[in-house]
């Protein structure tokens, strides 16, 4: 009986210790590794940036080797949005890093693949889709006649404008579908605020309810993040 009591007490102590360890682990930021393999960035500095409420602030930097390889490491408590740049002006690589992620970015600075982060891969796919939309949009605009003073030119302009409207509607529906299915994802901010030149892909006036819904959802989870506050 004495032994049993001792075992029960000892077991209780072990359980408490185990719970304390779990609590400690859950409150500690986990390591994230980002391995870069960028063919066009040999022996160059690259910068890891994060939105601080006013600008993309540099939080870390690393120099690639002769083969364009480098590794960035940082810690995070939950999902965080980062951009990678070589000149601190353009930010072609955007990642959403979750605790414990081991992300590999392979290719070149403008054309790369992401492995190890589902949401980062989705962001890249959305960027590619936006670039394709931009190219198609500009291609159609280029075909517009300089003048519509003749019936032929007027007819051509009407036809092309119909194609432009159809293209915009198709892409807009695609974006709204993605955002509606990812209301609690930081990537939704990037998608909602995307622009083609000076044109908003999803104008706020026409999509106010969706913007409000995303804002509400993200504030429940990431209300302390500057990028969510800025949104």
Task: State what each model feature region is.
Residues 165-172, 204-212:
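Helix-turn-helix repeat elements of alpha-solenoid scaffolds
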Residues 179, 183, 203-206, 223:
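Structural signature of alpha-solenoid helical repeat scaffolds
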Residues 210-231:
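N-proximal helix/coil linker or "cap" segments that precede and/or mark the start of modular domains
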Residues 184-198:
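Amphipathic alpha-helical repeat scaffolds of TPR domains
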Residues 25-178:
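A non-transmembrane, solvent-exposed segment enriched in polar/low-complexity residues
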Residues 1-37:
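Bacterial Sec-dependent N-terminal signal peptides
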Residues 175-179, 192-196, 215-219:
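Amphipathic alpha-helical segments within well-ordered protein domains
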Residues 117-120, 185, 225-228:
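Serine-centered coil/turn micro-motif
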């Amino acid at each position: 009986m004495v032994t049993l009591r001792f075992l029960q007490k000892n077991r209780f102590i072990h359980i408490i210790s185990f719970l304390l360890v779990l609590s400690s682990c859950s409150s500690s930021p986990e390591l994230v590794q980002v391995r870069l393999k960028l063919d066009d960035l040999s022996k160059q500095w690259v910068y890891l940036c994060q939105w601080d409420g006013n600008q993309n602030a540099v939080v870390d930097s690393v120099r690639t080797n002769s083969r364009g390889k480098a590794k960035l490491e940082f810690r995070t408590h939950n999902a965080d949005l980062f951009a990678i740049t070589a000149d601190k002006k353009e930010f072609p690589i955007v990642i959403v890093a979750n605790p414990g992620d081991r992300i590999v970015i392979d290719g070149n600075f403008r054309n790369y693949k992401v492995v190890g982060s589902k949401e980062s891969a989705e962001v890249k796919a959305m960027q590619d889709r936006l670039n394709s939309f931009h190219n198609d949009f500009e291609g159609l605009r280029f075909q517009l006649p300089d003048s519509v003073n003749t019936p032929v030119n007027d007819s051509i302009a009407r036809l092309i404008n119909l194609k432009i409207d159809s293209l915009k509607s198709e892409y807009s529906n695609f974006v709204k579908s993605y955002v509606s299915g990812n209301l609690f994802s930081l990537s939704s901010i990037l998608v909602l605020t995307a622009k083609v030149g000076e044109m908003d892909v999803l104008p706020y006036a026409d999509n106010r309810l969706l913007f409000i819904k995303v804002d509400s959802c993200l504030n429940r989870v990431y209300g302390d993040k500057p990028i969510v506050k800025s949104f």
